[in-house]
């Protein structure tokens, strides 16, 4: 009898496994986990980074100095309407895009990336290298180590989608770059290593590896559906296994 049981056990071991409901769920869960598991891990790791690093640090706010208030004593400047009348090519701009600012205490209007003298209405020259250095020196915590003019950028650049040309000023803190619009003279962006890691992980998170801005595309939708099915199949497998154990125990 012992020999018979041993032979039967060996036969059962090499007998093709029947595709029961539990086996089907297990196989499906295994393959789905293989396909979607890597992206699930990337979503988790990137999401963890997003929650651990404060957004203020990513934006480089801790490296910025608040600009000092500069009183403008001459109030004989032109109104926005008068300035627009002097420049018909800028008349397509809406009043919401007009900013009142100053350069060394002199009032100016900013219309997009164009600077206009608020007293005369004349267009001002683009920001010089020295002016860009002065702007960053007044706004950055750290020592300036370099400056260059950025004329164009790639679609995945750390300075994509912003005013060009722009001055890129490097300081000695966290390999930070301060970007100053050559036309507007505004400090438009600060890029640090924390931001670069954020940008890289963001590309992995939304699966847009080129422009890093679009999360409404087919690839991320398919992986999201597969990930949901993976989780649901795992839950179903747990329930089926639990019931099978209950029946065996009974």
Name each model feature, range by range.
Residues 17-250:
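Conserved histidines in hydrophobic membrane contexts and catalytic metal-binding motifs
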Residues 1-16:
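Short, Lys/Arg-enriched N-terminal segments with co-localized hydrophobic residues
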């Amino acid at each position: 009898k012992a020999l018979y049981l041993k032979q039967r056990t060996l036969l059962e071991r090499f007998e093709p496994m029947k595709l029961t409901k539990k086996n089907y769920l297990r196989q499906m869960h295994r393959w789905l986990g293989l396909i979607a598991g890597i992206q699930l891990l990337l979503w988790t790791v990137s999401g963890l980074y997003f929650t651990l690093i404060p957004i203020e640090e990513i934006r480089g706010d801790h490296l910025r100095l608040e600009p000092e208030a500069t009183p403008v004593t001459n109030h004989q400047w032109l109104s926005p309407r008068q300035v627009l009348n002097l420049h018909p090519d800028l008349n397509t701009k809406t009043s919401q895009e007009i900013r009142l600012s100053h350069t060394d205490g002199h009032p100016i209007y900013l219309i997009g990336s164009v600077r206009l003298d608020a007293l005369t209405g004349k267009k001002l020259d683009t920001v010089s290298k020295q002016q860009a250095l002065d702007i960053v020196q007044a706004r950055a915590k750290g020592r300036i180590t370099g400056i260059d003019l950025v004329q164009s950028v790639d679609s995945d650049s750390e300075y994509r989608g912003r005013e060009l040309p722009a001055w890129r000023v490097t300081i000695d803190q966290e390999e930070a770059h301060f970007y100053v619009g050559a036309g507007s003279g505004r400090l438009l962006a600060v890029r640090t290593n924390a931001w670069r890691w954020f940008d890289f992980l963001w590309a992995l998170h939304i699966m847009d590896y080129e422009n890093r801005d679009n999360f409404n595309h087919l690839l991320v939708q398919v992986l999201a559906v597969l990930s949901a099915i993976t989780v649901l199949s795992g839950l179903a497998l747990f329930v089926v296994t639990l019931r099978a154990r209950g029946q065996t125990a009974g």
